């Protein structure tokens, strides 16, 4: 069976116009070309698609069934050709973006929507991971882009462009004994269990770790749930409280004597210098760079 797009277009036109001659006019073909193409299609399918007893061809039941699927098949064939063309011009087969778990409450989906509108056939994979694991995914090639907080020490293999600033705040459950105090000291923080978002690799020291005793989790959702159950204090994204205002009734921001109890970090789009980025990844990087160059409103 050897069916091509032109045969399907002619079949669709005959079904919609009701005759070979009308289909020919619609497609800019001669009637004999349409008639021959339909005859060859019937041979390839081993089916009779049209009865030719009267002046105009009459679709058979089989033709009507196939016609229902023809439009979608033609759309998929066009999408296939467009995707093949995009791949030939440098579009990656798929793009994996890792989002640091504390940033899941931000507007990272804006960038995904932008990519989808520009590259509708691109396979996009979104994963979440702690900061240290996200960087490792870039360096080992399992992700091509990452949305991460700024790093104190840069790996010489990474490259980045700044996006914006985000804040994290130390919090504790309002039913925890420590919450009854208006101010707390660093010594009190040091002696209270901390719930820290950290790498799954226990050999890596977590960032924003202050307490002597701590429990680890790989995402801020779990950290929040444990903090709510009085299992410790922790540092959570301020954006969480905007998304879920009910948390303001259950959690208290810690006011620490010895340091400002609010951590502001730049958020970066990060990639590996050693990776050969495709057209979609490069497009997003260039988009963010160009946006940064625009004057603030």
From Swiss-Prot:
Compartment(s): Cytoplasm
Keyword entries, A-Z: Activator, Cytoplasm, DNA-binding, Repressor, Transcription, Transcription regulation
DNA-binding region location: 20-39
GO CC aspect terms: cytoplasm
Domain HTH lysR-type: 1-60
Entry annotated with the keyword Repeat: no
Protein's job: Regulates the expression of the AceI transporter. Binds DNA and chlorhexidine. Binds to regulatory sites within the intergenic region between the aceI and aceR genes, and affects the interaction between RNA polymerase (RNAP) and promoter DNA both in the presence and in the absence of chlorhexidine. In the absence of chlorhexidine, prevents transcription of the aceI gene by disrupting interactions between the promoter DNA and RNAP. In the presence of chlorhexidine, activates expression of aceI.
Domain notes: Binds DNA via its N-terminal domain and the inducer molecule via the C-terminal domain.
PANTHER family (alphabetical): HTH-TYPE TRANSCRIPTIONAL REGULATOR, LYSR FAMILY TRANSCRIPTIONAL REGULATOR
Protein name in the entry: HTH-type transcriptional regulator AceR
Lineage: Bacteria, Pseudomonadati, Pseudomonadota, Gammaproteobacteria, Moraxellales
Gene: aceR
């Amino acid at each position: 069976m050897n069916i091509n797009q032109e045969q399907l277009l002619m079949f669709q036109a005959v079904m919609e116009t009701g005759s070979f001659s009308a289909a020919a006019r619609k497609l800019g073909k001669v009637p004999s070309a349409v008639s021959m193409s339909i005859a060859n299609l019937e041979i390839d399918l081993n089916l009779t698609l049209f009865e030719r007893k009267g002046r105009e061809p009459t679709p058979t039941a089989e033709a009507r069934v196939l016609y229902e699927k023809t439009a979608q098949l033609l759309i998929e064939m066009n999408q296939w050709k467009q995707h093949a063309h995009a791949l030939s011009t440098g579009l990656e087969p798929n793009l994996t973006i890792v989002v640091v778990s504390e940033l899941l409450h931000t507007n990272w989906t804006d960038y995904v929507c932008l990519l989808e509108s520009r590259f509708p056939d691109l396979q996009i994979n979104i994963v979440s991971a702690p900061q240290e694991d996200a960087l490792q995914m870039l360096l080992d090639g399992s992700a091509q882009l990452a949305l991460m907080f700024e790093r104190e020490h840069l790996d010489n293999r990474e490259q980045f462009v700044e996006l914006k600033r985000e804040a994290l705040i130390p919090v504790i459950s309002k039913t925890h004994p420590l919450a009854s105090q208006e101010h707390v000291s660093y010594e009190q923080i040091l002696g209270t269990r901390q719930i820290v978002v950290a790498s799954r690799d226990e050999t890596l020291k977590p960032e924003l770790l202050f307490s002597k005793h701590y429990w680890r989790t790989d995402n801020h959702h779990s950290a929040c749930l444990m903090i709510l159950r009085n299992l410790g204090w922790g540092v959570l994204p301020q954006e969480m409280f905007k998304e879920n205002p009910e948390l303001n009734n259950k959690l208290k921001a810690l006011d620490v004597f010895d340091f400002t109890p609010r951590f502001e970090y730049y958020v970066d789009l990060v990639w590996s210098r050693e990776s050969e980025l495709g057209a979609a990844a490069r497009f997003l990087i260039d988009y963010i760079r160009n946006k940064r160059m625009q004057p603030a409103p």
